[in-house]
Regions:
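Active-site-adjacent mobile loop/cap segments within catalytic or ligand-binding domains
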Residues: 238-239, 256-263, 268-285, 289-291, ...
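Solvent-exposed, acidic/flexible segments
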Residues: 15, 91, 124-135, 206-214, ...
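Non-catalytic propeptide/linker segments at domain boundaries
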Residues: 2-103, 109, 164, 173
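Active-site histidine-acidic residue metal-binding/catalytic motifs
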Residues: 84-219, 238, 248-252, 259, ...
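Surface-exposed patches in mature extracellular/periplasmic domains of secreted proteins
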Residues: 145-156, 207, 229-233, 302-316, ...
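Sec-exported extracytoplasmic/periplasmic mature domains
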Residues: 136-147, 221-225, 234, 295-304, ...
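Structural recognition of the beta-strand scaffold that forms the well-ordered cores
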Residues: 97-101, 149-153, 227-232, 254-257, ...
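Mature extracellular/periplasmic domains of secretome proteins
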Residues: 213-226, 244-248, 328-333, 338
Length: 396
């Protein structure tokens, strides 16, 4: 579903970045830690990227010399903290446009998304519902601090106008091309790999994992045009059979920025283009310090330990143990700094009951222990982190 890249957008960054700056960003953020060479090459003078298009097979972007000023006047739509107008005794987030992206969809779609968790008949939590509630409370707090706040999703309905049925033909072709010429239409009564190899499962995945995120990307990039996006999620450990889920003893926090692209991912021309657009527009120079400050605040408020990635699809971004670089569709498509939050494990027993309590102020008794609202802690962690970052980095 990726768009055909407009390579002239990269060419507009000619002379904006030195080879040393490009190489550092590539090696420390955007590549896998011990990855293979990328499907593009750079010399002392320029970057050369295969486009995958017959009319123009390569895109060439000259580097600027180390001691020369930038020769590009290309400016992104978003603003760094240092580029915001002086505060002049106004609220600390004045002029800052924040988009809040509540993860997943929730509501009647939660079971399809596999973001529905219930340990007892008549009770459940749904990540899409929780993330939307968190976003609405967070918006109120941020507006009080002067921010302009837009919600990417405002209800328990999809942003995309497409539905799973729109992807049945494409899903059937995917399965046929993968060596399954007669895939089952429905996964009714199926589990495990057998369920994954059905037209229904593949169609649903294209709907909520791909089409929905592309629709949100269009809204962010074409309509909202914020200075920063906060993607609000709740994490989970494997809970086994959804009809008989298991609690996990683990509870943790991590924050994601964009990066850590595998050579295989970069073989796709749209992914290659989107990664280079982020790199050349220097999104990481704002995204990583902002994410780090928010992560530090979230850690203080929630008192959660850092999640530890053991897979090669993520790498630490900087020295903060809570912040990782990972290539996700949302943090790649949104053309501005994106802070992607993953606090709390929904199937951790205490967290599950805290989340069932929705949002409350103060403390309440859960499992014989006085606890705060997980959603209130989530909101407070973000607000304090944003205040710290922008009060430190914007003109006074």
């Amino acid at each position: 579903m990726g768009k055909t890249p407009d390579w002239s957008r990269l060419e507009a960054y000619a002379g904006s970045m030195s080879k040393a700056e490009f190489e550092q960003a590539w090696q420390q953020i955007y590549s896998e830690k011990n990855g293979l060479p990328p499907p593009f090459k750079f010399t002392d003078t320029h970057l050369e990227v295969p486009t995958g298009q017959l009319a123009k097979t390569t895109c060439r972007i000259p580097f600027r010399a180390d001691k020369e000023a930038s020769t590009s006047d290309q400016k992104p739509s978003w603003r760094r903290a240092r580029d915001l107008p002086p505060l002049e005794e106004r609220p600390p987030l004045s002029d800052l446009h924040i988009a809040l992206d509540p993860g997943h969809i929730g509501g009647s779609w939660a079971m399809m998304e596999e973001r529905f968790l219930s340990f007892k008949p008549g009770e459940d939590i749904r990540e899409g519902d929780l993330s939307l509630l968190t976003a609405k409370i967070l918006k109120e707090r941020l507006v009080k601090e002067g921010a302009i706040v837009s919600l990417v999703r405002e209800s328990l309905d999809p942003v995309t106008t497409k539905r799973p049925a729109d992807f049945e033909a494409e899903s059937r072709k995917v399965l046929t091309d993968a060596g399954f010429p007669t895939p089952a239409a429905s996964y009714q009564g199926l589990t495990g790999d057998a369920k994954l190899l059905t037209v229904q499962w593949q169609s649903e995945k294209l709907f909520y994992r791909v089409s929905e995120i592309h629709a949100r990307g269009e809204r962010v990039n074409q309509q909202i045009k914020p200075d920063v996006v906060l993607c609000l999620h709740f994490n989970a450990e494997s809970w086994g059979d959804a009809t008989s889920p298991q609690f996990s003893p683990k509870n943790h926090l991590h924050v994601l920025v964009n990066g850590c692209y595998s050579p295989g991912e970069l073989q796709q021309q749209d992914v290659r283009f989107e990664m280079l657009l982020r790199l050349l527009s220097r999104v990481h120079e704002e995204e990583i310090p902002l994410a780090t400050t928010v992560a530090e605040s979230m850690a203080r408020v929630t008192r959660l330990p850092a999640y530890l990635y053991s897979t090669p699809n993520a790498r630490q971004a900087g020295s903060n143990p809570y912040v990782y670089a990972r290539n996700l569709l949302a943090n790649r498509l949104y053309e501005c700094p994106v802070v992607y939050l993953e606090p709390f494990v929904m199937n951790h027993e205490e967290t599950y009951h805290r989340l069932r309590g929705q949002h409350f102020l103060g403390r309440t008794l859960i499992g014989g222990k006085l606890v705060t609202s997980a959603i209130e802690d989530y909101v407070n962690g973000i607000v304090r982190g944003l205040l710290s970052y922008y009060q430190t980095n914007r003109p006074s």
